[in-house]
């Protein structure tokens, strides 16, 4: 009796706690934050139709036989109120409703939607005959979006549509989407989540017409307004991820992480594939071990210590899960989960994976919360089992992404706030302070402070589940085949995903399975990873497929290590672009045509993309040429001056349409260009135990590129989740505090006195978030050597003489190092008489190409002589060396100039 009474009492308490937690939980907050109702002033309506003018370019068309219309948020749409009344006029003529906005001309006959009765003309697109949309039209020149997965793809796959098109219009169909509502009961049962996804109460056609012409960025930004912004990622997500499908033991994995540290190779995230849980020792009566939630004690005898050891090494951890088979009787949590869904554990009946059952969902997350309390930071949701649930039209992948992402940032619940009696944090040891802070379950076991528990960043790792999936980063693109074809598709695939707002893809860098070994392929893939949204190395359990750099030849190993180190160095730049993506609606990776939509050349370079505000990237996705010993790619440079990011060589693109050229790089380098006036902040790498350091750095290197004025605002924060809600150094978050620190940098290429000046302004906002003092290395890349006497450094207007000034001839870089600068001070570096742009070292670069080229020596001599004597005019002579003697073969040596070598020399001779 007492056991039954205790169970009943626990059930009552659980129900009370569930209701209390649901009222302020993440799922309810998500619903309450939404603005799903359209503005009354922008609605036109008949008995069965409704038209919402959301903006002057974004129109919602609804037809409902029942006369009911949808005002709930849906799986895709969270906001239909854009905060302003768009400009439009309405007239009735010849039985037609005509809506005229500055961007669109809509005609509608008031009848069920038809090709003849509903059309929209997009204004301002004069060079296409397809700028008129009739209901039901298939898009002809949509610029595409992304796809669910690259699983088992060897190269190109079809992509879904995006919200932009060269014809000026795109349509998103939301008719089949489920709605999300606040619901404390589902089918008569208590719903611990407080919100639920359910089918629409009525059937209707529900379309969103994007008619932005060639205003591509505006279209994507309004897509974010409609569907919700991209969240701010935690800083660790932007570093290097180590992932491998491999049966590591606990000690083996930690030893590997320690070797990376000794080698000076930084990682921030450990991805533990499925062998963390029981797989091979599962009794066949339960099915396969593909799904599992119980640690494999043979491989990980003390998993809590393992997770703690990873954290001590500066690594966050995600575990792979395949949820398909639910929770079975061999699992550690089976009894608790079975009871929650009404199954007697003694029967060993499997608990079905059913996301339409609130009892299962609640128990499912309790199971995950227990493991998170042990040290798991987020989850890799490896769903591969299709799109069917018990609820028609509800994709289980979408539900997993939605629920897991919101749950991951839940903070402490009310029940957890009462579970922290043994918390050891400073605030909780203050007299009378304990009740004011949120606690972690099992604090005494892990000794985790209140601040850590309350600072849960939302993050999940899963496949794309349709428009709106950008709300649930990071995206897992699936198991990639190791081929050049796979690499060749990824730059286009990544950039094009931005057309549907999906900016945080994570690919299997280096490829996951099958394919073949090609060391240059791996090196080029690592380089692309450095300039990808997320850089996650991954491979299968084959003994031949390890991605550790020391498994490769010396030059490839060095290239790989350099790529991984550069990625970590770029964290200040990447984190700033992370803020830009979250608060300005501009993804890190952009197709080239976003900035130049009316330039046909911008559409002809699918492998090329912009990487944030300052850089242009053109990855090499084919093998090195045997003769030149270099890799190549075609590049389009928009009008202006550009500088090689690594060595400062100057490229001039004078024409309005830009410039196309073939560029060549050795295996240690990829084509990355900075704009004139570009500013790129990097952090200096730590050593030893600090190699994986994720704190706001004490030492920074800032690359500054000449030829134009420039500015950059470095975004940093105190690491708190509250910073993800504010986004501005001047804005207070929900807790009434400022968490963001802005450091503004400006570059005056030539001021009124012809001097060059670079200024780092005092920090604004949360100064406590960054080191009180910093060491700065300002590197002016691509400039001529100057007299160091012309360089003047001032801190708050006072001369600073404790500086180091050097010049590197290889990278054409003037370096100015200033140490221990207060972050609240203003640092000025002035070069009297101004810096000069460096002359490209044509002879030296040509000599380097010819030195390594596999070709006749006599041709090298002839080519080098011609270049020295004639410069750019030598191009006409280079092909004449590809001849054999006409007469006596005894007096001459056959010569030859491979086309690839000529092309590499052309790039050098014609750069500027």
Task: Go through each PLM region and give its residues.
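Catalytic-domain carbohydrate-binding cleft regions of carbohydrate-active enzymes
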Residues: 4-5, 9-28, 34-35, 106, ...
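N-terminal-proximal low-complexity accessory segments that begin disordered
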Residues: 29-67
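Short, well-ordered beta-strand segments enriched in hydrophobic/aromatic residues
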Residues: 51, 59-63, 99-106, 616-619, ...
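A low-complexity, Ser/Thr/Gly/Pro-enriched, surface-exposed linker/loop concept
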Residues: 54-94
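Surface-exposed beta-strand/loop patches in extracellular or lumenal glycoproteins
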Residues: 59-67, 625-638, 765-786
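Solvent-exposed beta-hairpin/edge-strand motifs
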Residues: 71-77, 635-649, 778-801
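Hydrophobic or amphipathic alpha-helical targeting/insertion segments
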Residues: 100-118
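Accessory, solvent-exposed terminal regions and/or long lumenal/extracellular loops of proteins
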Residues: 674-801, 808-811, 818-824, 828-912
